[in-house]
Amino acid sequence: APDLITKLNHNLPFAINPPAIDNDYPQSRIFAVFQFMTKEVFIVAAARTPMGSFNGALSSVPATQLGAIAIKGALEKAGIDPNLVNEVFMGCVLQAGVGQAPARQASKFAGIGDHVPATTINKVCASGLKSVALGAQSIMLGLNDIVVAGGMENMSLTPHYLPNSRTGYRYGHVQALDGIVQDGLTDAYDKSLMGTCAELCAKEMNFSREEQDNYAIQSYT
């Protein structure tokens, strides 16, 4: 173990001080605690597309293209060359019909090179913010210097599903599942709708509708 500590200290930019070994317990081992000096993280620019209505003016634009527009806009505002981006995290919940690797598509359409890792995050409503958190953490740990993080969605292009189409339909009516309801707005366990969850949260936290509306207005003013 001392040789291992010496070797690690030789190769790492910080020293490891091993804790004392409890000789009363033969199974005890040395546990090295790595203390990283984390970097500060800054959001240097942000961009978004207009918030379109359902089946509105932007309804025919795929989520990946919307994401690309926002990525390109943010990079231009920050004055950052797309080739300097180290990694991309993009949230996307309704991925059916979008195509493989949505984050990769948005990244590529925005002019970021194929050599840059791009990861799609699905944490339902928190997908975009989780992407930002993952990007920040990667910078804090020294894994990246420049990260693109955000979210993209087009509910209007989300398809309906025919679950039994591969085995064939015979006699009778065929029921289609709405991809928005199935994968985006329904709890997978108790089948409650997300709108219900929002109402319960507002009631529990004592948020009035006026307060919610005023907060929402801040996002586009």
Please report, for each region that a protein language model flagged, where it lies by residue.
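Acyl-thioester C-C bond-transforming condensing/cleaving domain
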Residues: T38-K39, S53-L84, A96-A101, S107-T221
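Short glycine-rich phosphate-binding loop at a beta-alpha junction
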Residues: N86-G91
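Intrinsically disordered, low-complexity serine/threonine-rich segments
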Residues: N17, F31-F34, V85, G128
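Short, positively charged and aromatic/hydrophobic N-terminal segments
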Residues: P13, A20-V33
